[in-house]
Every structure is written in structure tokens, then in C-alpha cells.
A protein has these predicted regions:
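Lipid interaction determinants
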Residues: 1-44, 55-176
């Protein structure tokens, strides 16, 4: 069955990674928060997700690591309730399970800092994703991470981590 990006809104936890050498990692410490198109990945990157047929491509507007040699793209399919991603440019397979089916607001602001760096603030239900100023965080709106980042969104800017970030593009309803 085809996977539609619109079906993927919510918090996902990686249940399995199978590498090119057959190695397996079943640790569930990798999370991915998906909004309308915006996403934040706990491995340290964020940006817009694009879909071309059954292939999802994660564009990394914010990336804490140097760019890899290939685009981050995976062919997606359902195996029951498990979302299976198979590498397009690299040999791997990841199995994702929905960690939380979130109801409520879904919005994102693609940001620019005063020094020109990119950032992203998104919200899906009661969770938020932040990427910018050297950090990537997924947490609860109003929770300790939100408070520590000093996030204060408005229509045309977001105050966070001691800076005023300009909103370059937004999607969905209000983040606050």
C-alpha cells in the first residue's frame, strides 16, 4: 500500500535499523517528529520533507553534521502498522513505529537568525520540534526543553535561545 506523507504526521520511533553489512540496531532512541511538511529528527537534522511517488526525501535545512555524499531519500511502504524505509542512494532499511498519534495544532515556522543561520520550530499536538543554534530538540510544548530554549513565537518572528529569528515561511496554524 502506498504511503502518503499526510498519513505520517506525528511522532515516530525507529524500532529497527538494518545496515548494508546486515548489522541490526533495535534501540528505540531515534525519534522523528513529522508535521505537514516540516520535520525534526533527533539525530540532529530538520527541514522540509518532500514526496515523489513512494520516495520520501528529507531536505536538511538544519544539520548538526556535515552533509553526506547522497541525498537523504528512502522508498516507503507499510508493513502492517510499521512504516518501512529502504534507502534509495544507500543500502539500509529502517522500521518506524508511531510513538504517539497526536491531535491538535500542526504548524511550523522555517526561520532565519540575525546572522543568517537557518532554524525550524514546529508543533504537532502537544509536542514541538526545534532545530537551530547548534541544537535539535523534540519535547513537550511548555515543558522543560521549551522553557530552557526560551521559545516565544509570534506571527513574524520567534524569540528563542536569546535571539530573534525571522519567519521566512510558515505552514499550518499558529505554533503557540
Amino acid at each position: 500500500m502506498d504511503v502518503l506523507m499526510a498519513e505520517c504526521t506525528g511522532l515516530w520511533r525507529r524500532a529497527l535499523l538494518v545496515g548494508a553489512d546486515g548489522s541490526r540496531d533495535a534501540g528505540g532512541n531515534v525519534r522523528w517528529l513529522q508535521g505537514i511538511t516540516a520535520y525534526v529528527d533527533s539525530r540532529g537534522f530538520a527541514g522540509p520533507l518532500h514526496q515523489h511517488g513512494n520516495v520520501f526525501e528529507w531536505h536538511r535545512d538544519v544539520d548538526l553534521e556535515p552533509p553526506g555524499p547522497f541525498p537523504d531519500a528512502g522508498a516507503m511502504h507499510w508493513d502492517g502498522d510499521v512504516l518501512v524505509e529502504t534507502g534509495v542512494h544507500e543500502d539500509y532499511s529502517e522500521h518506524w513505529v508511531r510513538d504517539a498519534d497526536l491531535a491538535g495544532p500542526c504548524a511550523a515556522a522555517f526561520l532565519r537568525s540575525p546572522d543568517g543561520a537557518r532554524g525550524l520550530l514546529m508543533r504537532v499536538g502537544d509536542l514541538f520540534g526545534w532545530a537551530g543554534a547548534g541544537s535539535v530538540v523534540i519535547g513537550a510544548v511548555g515543558g522543560v526543553e521549551w522553557t530552557n530554549l526560551r521559545i516565544a513565537p509570534s506571527d513574524d518572528h520567534v524569540d528563542a535561545v536569546g535571539q530573534r529569528w525571522s519567519v521566512e515561511l510558515s505552514e499550518g496554524k499558529s505554533i503557540s
